[in-house]
A protein has these predicted regions:
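Bacterial N-terminal signal peptides that target proteins for export
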Residues: 2-15
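Short, structured helix-loop boundary elements
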Residues: 7, 38-41, 70, 90
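C-terminal motif of bacterial Sec signal peptides marking the signal peptidase cleavage site
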Residues: 21-24
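Electrostatic cytochrome c docking/interface patches
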Residues: 26-49
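Short, non-ligating residues that shape and space the ligands of small metal-coordination modules
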Residues: 31, 62-63
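Extracytoplasmic electron-transfer domains, predominantly the class I c-type cytochrome c fold
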Residues: 46, 64-130
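The −1 position to Zn-ligating cysteines in a subset of zinc-ribbon hairpins
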Residues: 52
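Helix-to-catalytic-loop junction in kinase catalytic cores
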Residues: 57
């Protein structure tokens, strides 16, 4: 009588394990931290056009921003990583925008001389793209 119960328990466990594995591996991007909302998104949009970011990137809401060199910035706020390696948070994004070569030497993204305040506003705009 104990054997059928053990077999039932083993069968149930074997059915549940794959579901747990899939659930554990599912990755949803964490929401950007509250400090990422600092800055002025409206000004950030203007700066993105001014610095010519759309020459390399496709950026929603920015006129003539259909570049295909860099990755599209669609749904940027929902991403887990910046440049494929940095956790997506406001500090990392501001550092990346201001001086990408200091963050990842040899990256294709050029250093455009973006000031700290401009980087903050550009980051604020990008975080609206979620």
């Amino acid at each position: 009588m104990m054997l059928p119960r053990r077999l039932w328990a083993l069968g149930a466990a074997l059915m549940i394990l794959p579901m747990l594995a899939v659930t554990a591996c599912a990755s949803t991007a964490p929401p950007p931290p509250p400090e990422s909302r600092n800055g002025r998104p409206d000004r950030g949009a203007e700066l993105i056009a001014q610095y010519g970011c759309g020459s390399c990137h496709t950026i929603p809401g920015i006129n003539r921003a259909g570049g295909l060199v860099g990755p599209p910035l669609t749904r940027f706020g929902a991403r887990s990583y910046i440049a494929g390696q940095l956790p997506n948070n406001a500090d990392n994004l501001r550092r990346w925008i201001a001086d990408p070569q200091a963050v990842e030497p040899g990256t294709a993204m050029p250093n455009l001389g973006v000031s700290a305040i401009d980087a903050q506003d550009i980051a604020a705009y990008l975080y609206t793209l979620d």
